[in-house]
Amino acid sequence: GHMVNAIYQIDEFANLGANSIETDVSFDDNANPEYTYHGIPCDCGRSCLKWENYNDFLKGLRSATTPGNSKYQSKLILVVFDLKTGSLYDNQASEAGKKLAKNLLKHYWNNGNNGGRAYIVLSIPDLNHYPLIKGFTDTLKQEGHPELLEKVGYDFSGNDAVGDVAKAYKKAGVSGHVWQSDGITNCLLRGLTRVKEAVANRDSGNGYINKVYYWTVDKRATTRDALDAGVDGVMTNYPDVIADVMNEAAYKNKVRLATYEDSPWVTFKK
């Protein structure tokens, strides 16, 4: 589910069939995660202005992903944080990672004490901001919770050349837990050339990519094209449309929604 920035939308998208949501994170001048907010412009047909304070959103998300909680949504298993680091200077990336880790540890993971169970993908728009990853991972280790890194994956969302993305991960010291996004706003069309390149890297056996997702997919035809190209996931404003296509004869025996028992970091072998 794309652009889930208000707490009530967590339920809304999960009830439409989403097993994963994407949430925008904006930062203040000191690299603190501040709001879950996208702003104008955004996808056609959507309100761009929904928001929460980031820490409040994390608490709402924790409720939705903690078994036994009255707000628990059992099929919600993955959250992509679309980190709007474009407002920061490059030299603030590491600091943003540190602060993100502390916020998640306290408000989402409940300091490691029966917090939310969803897997988290940190999605970074700029390859130059790769130090955010080390800031994040080092902080979780320093805070005594390296085990939570098992729950965390990474994505560079700038549609950069696949080779350049690989280099950024090398600099960040990341091997594994890598999702590769490709896409564009639903207001515009984008072909599947780079998606196919990413899928080939994933399936090569020696590439850096574990999973590939395509965004924003709102139409049945685009959903079919993406599934045919071999993606692991799609981001959509209409989870019910995706569910309909997955139930079509051509797909219902080939693809299914991932559950909590499926690892988001292990490349699926056909």
Curated annotation (Swiss-Prot):
The keyword Lyase applies. Mg(2+) binds at E22, D24, D82. Its cofactor is Mg(2+). SUPFAM superfamilies: PLC-like phosphodiesterases. Its main location: secreted. Binds 1 Mg(2+) ion per subunit. It holds the Pfam family GDPD_2. Disulfide bonds join C42-C48, C44-C187. GO terms for biological process: killing of cells of another organism; lipid catabolic process. Its EC number is 4.6.1.-. Transmembrane segments: none annotated. It is found in: Secreted. Expressed by the venom gland. One of its GO terms (molecular function) is lyase activity. Keywords: Cytolysis, Dermonecrotic toxin, Disulfide bond, Hemolysis, Lipid degradation, Lipid metabolism, Lyase, Magnesium, Metal-binding, Secreted, Toxin. It catalyses: an N-(acyl)-sphingosylphosphocholine = an N-(acyl)-sphingosyl-1,3-cyclic phosphate + choline; an N-(acyl)-sphingosylphosphoethanolamine = an N-(acyl)-sphingosyl-1,3-cyclic phosphate + ethanolamine; a 1-acyl-sn-glycero-3-phosphocholine = a 1-acyl-sn-glycero-2,3-cyclic phosphate + choline; a 1-acyl-sn-glycero-3-phosphoethanolamine = a 1-acyl-sn-glycero-2,3-cyclic phosphate + ethanolamine. InterPro entries: PLC-like_Pdiesterase_TIM-brl. GO terms for cellular component: extracellular region. Dermonecrotic toxins cleave the phosphodiester linkage between the phosphate and headgroup of certain phospholipids (sphingolipid and lysolipid substrates), forming an alcohol (often choline) and a cyclic phosphate. This toxin acts on sphingomyelin (SM). It may also act on ceramide phosphoethanolamine (CPE), lysophosphatidylcholine (LPC) and lysophosphatidylethanolamine (LPE), but not on lysophosphatidylserine (LPS), and lysophosphatidylglycerol (LPG). It acts by transphosphatidylation, releasing exclusively cyclic phosphate products as second products. Belongs to the arthropod phospholipase D family. Class II subfamily. This is Dermonecrotic toxin LhSicTox-alphaIA2aiii. The lineage of its organism: Eukaryota, Metazoa, Ecdysozoa, Arthropoda, Chelicerata.
